[in-house]
Amino acid sequence: MARKKIREYDSKRLLKEHLKRLAGIDLQILSAQVTQSTDFTELVNQQPWLSTMKLVVKPDMLFGKRGKSGLVALNLDIAQVKEFVKERLGVEVEMGGCKAPITTFIVEPFVPHDQEYYLSIVSERLGSTISFSECGGIEIEENWDKVKTIFLPTEKPMTPDACAPLIATLPLEARGKIGDFIKGVFAVFQDLDFSFLEMNPFTIVNGEPYPLDMRGELDDTAAFKNFKKWGNIEFPLPFGRVLSSTEGFIHDLDEKTSASLKFTVLNPKGRIWTMVAGGGASVIYADTVGDLGYASELGNYAEYSGAPNEEEVLQYARVVLDCATADPDGRKRALLIGGGIANFTDVGATFSGIIRALREKESKLKAARMHIYVRRGGPNYQTGLAKMRKLGAELGVPIEVYGPEATMTGICKQAIECVMAAA
């Protein structure tokens, strides 16, 4: 499962659309998204309620505590909303130690209310955890002792009996409506492959549940079966994260393939770089370098998996090598081409793409005094390793090659010793 956060606008859009389909509950929520490209005149023409109702506006940027941070404006008309957005759009704010400009807002009707409820659903390994409280809102953390929680195993349906402990202390007249709402939201959660969903708070308007603030995460590995249900969904980067041009290139490449291609620059001046096969292995290599005390020298995080073809690996490796060899300073550098023992990825084929990239970047590798350490196993690995050994001799670039007889992370220590040596 790959949990990906989505904007509040999309969370509410999905809930409104599919709660009616799955549970017959017609949420009366309205919302509009505002970005740099928004024309307010056109927006109001498309959504006339914006000019007839009092409004709420807030950033929709995947960070919480917006109310406590003074980033939520209440009871405005559309002209005031426009001014609020104008003053803050593109302005950098700091949240949770991360700084980034605000680029996206959500605008909704202002809903006066007295009661605030809390609801969250979290996907766990063996089922789902559902939490509910009658004391929702910005003080939910201070009132966490009042939150009721149940665990629903994967094979169990959300029945009235299962839901009963959550709503047991509600007034009798409210239990049916809120219980049906919780069951309906859970149906949407499962049907659309949400991995996390939170409403803090939701309230009751004209006798019906009404989400005021909402967060959602989807399991993006389920996109293949949900693309029609999700519609034009966006998976924004985490707040404060901006892709470099090289990272953006790999991100676009990853979007176009059934394989997985990931690349993040951690320290452009780092002297230890990785190009690792497998999601688990890639983390192990990075952690090992850190555990040995050299996290500050780690240049990147990189992972390829899911049997990418030779051309995809070639494009991927070019980017990694360009970053790893940039701005040579006379000191040694190391590249870890590692991985575990593949089950189905043709090691010979993926290494062919890497070898082509290494040939192209020969002069850069030498200028950067790059030492390469290879460890891999799996289908056709002997062919791949033999090609790597031959390449080292041809290029005159130091390449040490190991198969599954060597420990997976042994090359990390060798790389560190190499770059830290005086010569």
Swiss-Prot record:
Pfam families: Citrate_bind, Citrate_synth_N
GO MF entries: ATP binding; ATP citrate synthase activity
Group of enzyme by EC: transferase
Catalysed reaction equations from the record: oxaloacetate + acetyl-CoA + ADP + phosphate = citrate + ATP + CoA
GO cellular component terms attached to this protein's record: cytosol
Family: Belongs to the succinate/malate CoA ligase beta subunit family.
Oligomeric form and interacting partners: Heterooctamer of 4 alpha and 4 beta chains.
Protein name, as recorded: ATP-citrate synthase alpha chain protein 2
Organism per entry: Oryza sativa subsp. japonica (Rice)
Gene: ACLA-2
